[in-house]
Every structure is written in C-alpha cells, then in structure tokens.
C-alpha cells in the first residue's frame, strides 16, 4: 500500500513577522504574493491568512496603479527574479 505524504502546514509570513499594515510602496513585502509574471498568487499557494491576503491584494493593486510594479509581463520578458530591475 502506498504511503501517505505528510504535508507541512503553511503559515502566514506576515503574521509571523507581526505586520499590522502592508504598505504599497514596500515592494519587498509584496514580492512573496506575486508570481514571476506579476500575477497575484492565491492564499492556498502562499499560505497567508485571509486578513493579510486582503491587505496584500489592495497594496498590489495600489502599487500597480502608481506604476511601482507592472500589471503584466509578456512571456518573452519573463525573468527569474522579477524584482531585479526595480
């Protein structure tokens, strides 16, 4: 019989760091919630809590609006580290 995989419990990085407010100008905090194509990653992949996920989404949308991070990247321009040029 096949062995069951033991998954490690995901935890919220923002709760562990005791972050009360996520600022849209702090791109270092936002990079954990973005994929390599600058898409917002869901909670089930990042492990963030519902409260912090909502704050992250709002901060990312504000950062996109003021052009701190791009809305989307072409497939040809995908880089391994999206925050290298920022």
UniProtKB/Swiss-Prot annotation:
UniProt KW keywords: Ribonucleoprotein, Ribosomal protein, RNA-binding, rRNA-binding
Pfam families on file: Ribosomal_S18
GO CC field: cytosolic small ribosomal subunit
GO BP of this protein: translation
GO molecular function: small ribosomal subunit rRNA binding; structural constituent of ribosome
Listed transmembrane segments: none
Family matches, as InterPro entries: Ribosomal_bS18 (IPR001648), Ribosomal_bS18_sf (IPR036870)
Domain of life according to the entry: Bacteria
Keyword Ribosomal protein belongs to the record: yes
The protein's role, per its UniProt record: Binds as a heterodimer with protein bS6 to the central domain of the 16S rRNA, where it helps stabilize the platform of the 30S subunit.
NCBIfam families found in the cross-reference section: S18 (TIGR00165)
Similarity field: Belongs to the bacterial ribosomal protein bS18 family.
PANTHER family listed in its UniProt record: 30S RIBOSOMAL PROTEIN S18, SMALL RIBOSOMAL SUBUNIT PROTEIN BS18M
HAMAP family for this protein: Ribosomal_bS18
Subunit structure: Part of the 30S ribosomal subunit. Forms a tight heterodimer with protein bS6.
Name the record gives this protein: Small ribosomal subunit protein bS18
Source organism per UniProt: Campylobacter lari (strain RM2100 / D67 / ATCC BAA-1060)
Taxonomic lineage: Bacteria, Pseudomonadati, Campylobacterota, Epsilonproteobacteria, Campylobacterales
